[in-house]
C-alpha cells in the first residue's frame, strides 16, 4: 500500500510555505522542504526559509542540512526525503512536501531506482535533452522508437523514451507514494508584484549582507549559483550599481517563476489553484480531507 503524501508546489513567492504550515497544523503533519537552496546553512534570507517561529510551530525537514561548501543533488534529495517521509509516517503523521524545485520533487514521486547501473546524472541529462522538443517532435520520436502511448501527453512520452533509452534500469522503478499535488498560481501581474515586493523585503531583512558573506567566502560553490545571490555579485565587484543589481535580481526571479510554472504544468500531474480567488484555502483543505479519507 502506497503512502499518501501532500505535495505543495508553485512558483517562488506564491505562498507555499504558509499553506504547508496550515495543512500541517490541520492534519497533524510535518513539512519536508523540496527546495534545492534551503538545504544550506547560513543562507536564510535569499532562500526564503520558514522563519524560526514557523519552524518552531511545525516541524520542518531538509532545511540547514549542508554547509555552503558542500554539493547537493537530486540523488541526495530523493535519498534523504525517502528516509524523512518514512520517519514521519512511522510516528503517525502526514508528510507534506513543499517547495519549488520541480526536478527534485518529480524524481521523488516517480521513484527512480537510484541504485541501478545507470548513473542518476545521466538520466537527468537525457531528460533535459528532451525538454526543447515540441509535442509533435516527441510524438515522432516515440513513433520512431516503436513505442505505443495511449492518450499521448508530454509526460508519458518522455517517460517512455527514457525507459526505452536506459532499459530495465528505469523500468524497475519503485513508486512508494500516492501524492495529492497542489500547485499554487496567481495572475501573472499579481505574481510579479509579489515577487518584486518580496525582494524588497529581503533587502530590508539583510539580504545584501548575507550575499556579501557568501561572495567573500565561497563565490564559486554550488550554493552561490542559486537565484538571490549571484545576481548581486556584479555589484560587489563594482560592475553594477546597487539599483541595477536589485532590478537584475527581481528580473531573474520573475523569469525563474515562469520556468517553474512551465515545469509543473508540463511535467507533473497537478491541481492548480489561483491564490487570488475567494475561499481558495478552504477548497484546498477540503480536497486534502477528501483525499486522506478516501
Swiss-Prot record:
Binding site for substrate: 12-17
This enzyme's EC code(s): 2.5.1.75
Chain segments carrying region Interaction with substrate tRNA: 35-38
Cofactors (names): Mg(2+)
Sorted UniProt keywords: ATP-binding, Magnesium, Nucleotide-binding, Transferase, tRNA processing
Site feature: Interaction with substrate tRNA: 101, 127
A Gene Ontology biological process term: tRNA modification
Entry binding sites for ATP: 10-17
A GO term, aspect molecular function: ATP binding
Protein's UniProt name: tRNA dimethylallyltransferase
Function description: Catalyzes the transfer of a dimethylallyl group onto the adenine at position 37 in tRNAs that read codons beginning with uridine, leading to the formation of N6-(dimethylallyl)adenosine (i(6)A).
Similarity-based family: Belongs to the IPP transferase family.
Organism field: Streptococcus pneumoniae (strain Hungary19A-6)
Quaternary structure (record): Monomer.
InterPro entries reported for this sequence: Dimethylallyltransferase, IPT, P-loop_NTPase
Pfam families according to UniProt: IPPT
Reaction(s) catalysed by this chain's protein: adenosine(37) in tRNA + dimethylallyl diphosphate = N(6)-dimethylallyladenosine(37) in tRNA + diphosphate
Amino acid at each position: 500500500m502506497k503512502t499518501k503524501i501532500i505535495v505543495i508546489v508553485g512558483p517562488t513567492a506564491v505562498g507555499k510555505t504558509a499553506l504547508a504550515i496550515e495543512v500541517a497544523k490541520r492534519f497533524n503533519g510535518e513539512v519536508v522542504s523540496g527546495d534545492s537552496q534551503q538545504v544550506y546553512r547560513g543562507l536564510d534570507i535569499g532562500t526564503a526559509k520558514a522563519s524560526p517561529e514557523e519552524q518552531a510551530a511545525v516541524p520542518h525537514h531538509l532545511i540547514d542540512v549542508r554547509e555552503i561548501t558542500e554539493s547537493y543533488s537530486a540523488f541526495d534529495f530523493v535519498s534523504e526525503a525517502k528516509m524523512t517521509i518514512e520517519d514521519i509516517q512511522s510516528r503517525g503523521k502526514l508528510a507534506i512536501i513543499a517547495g519549488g524545485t520541480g526536478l527534485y520533487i518529480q524524481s521523488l514521486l516517480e521513484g527512480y531506482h537510484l541504485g541501478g547501473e545507470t548513473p542518476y546524472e545521466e538520466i537527468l541529462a537525457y531528460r533535459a535533452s528532451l525538454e526543447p522538443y515540441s509535442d509533435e517532435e516527441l510524438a515522432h520520436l516515440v513513433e520512431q522508437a516503436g513505442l505505443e502511448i495511449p492518450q499521448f501527453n508530454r509526460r508519458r512520452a518522455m517517460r517512455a523514451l527514457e525507459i526505452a533509452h536506459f532499459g530495465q534500469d528505469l523500468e524497475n522503478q519503485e513508486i512508494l507514494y500516492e501524492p495529492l499535488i497542489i500547485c499554487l498560481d496567481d495572475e501573472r501581474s499579481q505574481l510579479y508584484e509579489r515577487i518584486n515586493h518580496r525582494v524588497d523585503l529581503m533587502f530590508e531583512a539583510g539580504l545584501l549582507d548575507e550575499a556579501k558573506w557568501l561572495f567573500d567566502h565561497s563565490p564559486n560553490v554550488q550554493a552561490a549559483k542559486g537565484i538571490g545571490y549571484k545576481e548581486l555579485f556584479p555589484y560587489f565587484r563594482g560592475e553594477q550599481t546597487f539599483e541595477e543589481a536589485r532590478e537584475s535580481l527581481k528580473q531573474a526571479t520573475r523569469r525563474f517563476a515562469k520556468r517553474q510554472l512551465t515545469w509543473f504544468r508540463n511535467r507533473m500531474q497537478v491541481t492548480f489553484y489561483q491564490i487570488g480567488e475567494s475561499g481558495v484555502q478552504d477548497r484546498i483543505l477540503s480536497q486534502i480531507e477528501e483525499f486522506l479519507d478516501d
